[in-house]
UniProtKB/Swiss-Prot annotation:
It catalyses: a ribonucleotidyl-ribonucleotide-RNA + H2O = a 3'-end 3'-phospho-ribonucleotide-RNA + a 5'-end dephospho-ribonucleoside-RNA + H(+). It holds the Pfam family Ribonuclease_T2. N-linked core structure at Asn-138 contains xylose. GO terms for molecular function: ribonuclease T2 activity; RNA binding. The active site is at H55 (proton donor), E106, K109, H110 (proton acceptor). It comes from Pyrus pyrifolia (Chinese pear). This is Ribonuclease S-3. Disulfide bonds join C37-C44, C70-C113, C177-C215, C192-C203. Self-incompatibility (SI) is the inherited ability of a flowering plant to prevent self-fertilization by discriminating between self and non-self pollen during pollination. In many species, self-incompatibility is controlled by the single, multiallelic locus S. The lineage of its organism: Eukaryota, Viridiplantae, Streptophyta, Embryophyta, Tracheophyta.
Length: 222
């Protein structure tokens, strides 16, 4: 009988452990709409804005693969009231009539893995809105404060990084670029925080020089 009880106990522990997915930090990634439309084979149906808007909030790991499509702990669907704000800060750049599909995909693939910091679907989107608006992690505004405007000029990597550092407790961001012809455009900027989502950290895993998304030291168009 004791052996049966022990077996049941171990089985419960294994089930609980297998349903808990670990992560080390969050990536809060924003994409520059104009560059996304310029560098992608998929045509944007709507004219892009000269703004960085949300791509996603992703639980990530320092080592090994990032978690994806995790079991959902608590079900609380996204409130319609939030969608008015999401339409502004988190549009589907390629087709704004498909915003809901984009949000659903980001929640299912990434947000579902943020437990316990992210408690449910509604909390995931509330957290992103808070980070972008209340916590002033709007990359466009951070750059603008440093007099770096989206005027199509070519910038030095260090100038962009330093501007972002000034708005992120001097922590290093992750930049993604895309080369089109002879022009390299700034496509995404990622801010990283600890697993609580409360404190900035240096972003690990920068793109290597052999990557098509590597940002050179100079002549980055923004």
């Amino acid at each position: 009988m004791v052996h049966v009880v022990m077996m049941v106990f171990l089985l419960i522990v294994l089930i609980l452990c297998s349903s808990t997915v670990g992560y080390d930090y969050f990536q809060f990634t924003q994409q520059y709409q104009l560059a996304v439309c310029n560098s992608n084979r998929t045509l944007c149906k709507d004219p892009p804005d000269k703004l960085f808007t949300v791509h996603g909030l992703w639980p990530s790991n320092m080592v090994g693969p990032d978690p994806s499509k995790c079991p959902i702990k608590n079900i609380r669907k996204r409130e319609k009231l939030l969608e008015h704000q999401l339409e502004i800060i988190w549009p589907n750049v390629f087709d704004r009539t498909k915003n809901n599909l984009f949000w659903d995909k980001e929640w299912m693939k990434h947000g579902s893995c943020g437990y316990p910091t992210i408690d449910n679907e509604n909390h995931y989107f509330e957290t992103v809105i808070k980070m972008y608006i209340s916590k002033k992690q709007n990359v466009s505004r951070i750059l603008s404060k440093a007099k770096i405007e989206p005027d199509g000029k070519k910038r030095a990597l260090l100038d962009i990084e330093n501007a972002i550092r000034n708005g992120a407790d001097n922590k290093k961001p992750k930049l993604k670029c895309q080369k089109k012809g002879t022009t390299t455009e700034l496509v995404e900027i990622t801010l990283c925080s600890d697993k609580s989502g409360e404190h900035f950290i240096d972003c690990p895993h920068p793109f290597e020089p052999i990557s098509p998304h590597y940002c050179p030291t100079n002549n980055i168009k923004y």
